[in-house]
Structure formats: C-alpha cells, structure tokens
Amino acid sequence: MLLRLPPVFLTVLIAIASCSVYILNIAIESGFADSPYNFNQTTVGLAYMSTGIGYILSSMAGGRWMDSIMAREARKVVRSDSHGKLISLPEDHMKENAWVANTLYPLSSLWFGWTMYYGVQFMVPISALFVFGFTLMLHFTLGTTMLTEFVRKRSSAGVTVNNFVRNILSCVGTIVAAPWMKGVGLRYMMTKLCIICLLLGSLGIWLITRNAQRWRGTLDKALKEMD
C-alpha cells in the first residue's frame, strides 16, 4: 500500500544505490585478485576497509550536516512553533547534501572501474572506494530519515518497505554483477552503473523537492484512510 504513495515510491527509487553496493563488492574482489594487483585473500579483504571507513565517518558527520541544513531551511522561512522551536519538513533533508551524495557515489564507482582497468597504483581505486562509502552513507541516511518524516504515523512501515526494496535490489546486484562484468568488462559496467544511478537518483530528488508540498497533503489523507 505504501509503495503506491509517490513520495514513498520515489524515496525507494533513490535506494537503487543498494544495488550498486553489491555490484561494487564483487568488482572489488575480482578486480584486486586479478593482474596487475594479484592481491591474496587477506589483502583483498583489507581493501574493503576503505569503504567501511567511509561509512563510519559519514555516519558521524552526515547527520550533523543534515541537521544544520534543516535548521537553516526552517530559519530561512521563519518556520517555528509557539515555543520558538524550529519546524522541519521532509523536503528540507534534500538540499545540497542530496545532490552531492547522489553525484559523488556514482562518479566514485566510475573512478574505481576505470582506474582498476588501467592498473593504476592501488591507492587510487582504494581512495575511490572511500569516497563511495562516505557519500553512499549520506545517501542512505537522508533517504531513510526523509521517509520517516513523510510517514510519521507509520514510520516503521515506511522503513520496512524501504529495507524490503533495498534487499531485493541487493539480491539483483549480487546476481547480475559477475556475468555483467564478464560480458562488458569492469570499466563499462561501472560506466553504465554510474549513469543509471545518476539518472534515477537525480530524478527522484528533483521530483520530491518539486512536489513535496503538494504530496504531503495527499499523503496525510491517504494515511488517515489506512487507519
């Protein structure tokens, strides 16, 4: 039922990023294990740490950045309650942070794919993985937080739907990654993945920011009918 509501569907659409995570994970393993890197299993495992460090740092800094953006947007239009507490709206989550995250995580996968193809010194693709992890966590955080704001009365259901779709996309990514990479090569796979993620993510962000005010009324009415 919730997926029929536009803001929920589009927030889940932005979660296409989940698919890219698992495609990249398989690309890391096969890429570093092959020539010219020829990493052993332990070293390949250590390569995943750069993405993990990006996740950790982003989870620490991303929330503060998003909070500052939301407070700025509320102050800009003097939106507060009778006690002077700032009131934020769901679309306040998607400002420059959304565009930065949605742009950099696909581009970092492109960076990774092409530097791996040309056998550039291993710290260069490793750096791409760090940027990917950092910006992807920003992407996940703002998407989940905004979704709970849209469906406050059913926030747990909204997050469940989001996770359900993410898991499906993760499964798809895991299944298609190896044959896709074998068919077109790492660089072209990452190029196509970059384009898909950029287009779908940008479309979702643009539609939400453009229509959020109108959709809030429709969403509140629909949620009341579900009660």
Swiss-Prot record:
Function: MFS-type transporter; part of the Fusarium detoxification of benzoxazolinone cluster 1 (FDB1) involved in the degradation of benzoxazolinones produced by the host plant. Maize, wheat, and rye produce the 2 benzoxazinone phytoanticipins 2,4-dihy-droxy-7-methoxy-1,4-benzoxazin-3-one (DIMBOA) and 2,4-dihydroxy-1,4-benzoxazin-3-one (DIBOA) that, due to their inherent instability once released, spontaneously degrade to the more stable corresponding benzoxazolinones, 6-methoxy-2-benzoxazolinone (MBOA) and 2-benzoxazolinone (BOA), respectively.
Gene Ontology terms: cellular component: plasma membrane
Top-level division of the source organism's lineage: Eukaryota
Assigned keywords, A-Z: Glycoprotein, Membrane, Transmembrane, Transmembrane helix, Transport
Induction text: Expression is induced in response to 2-benzoxasolinone (BOA) exposure.
Family: Belongs to the major facilitator superfamily.
Transmembrane segments: 8-28, 43-63, 100-120, 122-142, 164-181, 188-208
Annotated SUPFAM superfamilies: MFS general substrate transporter
Subcellular location: Membrane
MF (Gene Ontology): polyamine transmembrane transporter activity
Major localization listed first in the record, in broad terms: membrane
Protein name per Swiss-Prot or TrEMBL: MFS-type transporter FVEG_08288
Gene knockout outcome: Does not affect BOA degradation.
Other known facts: Fusarium verticillioides possesses 2 unlinked loci, FDB1 and FDB2, necessary for detoxification of antimicrobial compounds produced by maize, including 2-benzoxazolinone (BOA). The FDB2 cluster arose as a duplication of the FDB1 cluster with rearrangement and expansion by incorporating additional genes.
Biological-process GO terms, alphabetical: intracellular polyamine homeostasis
Glycosylation-annotated residues: N40
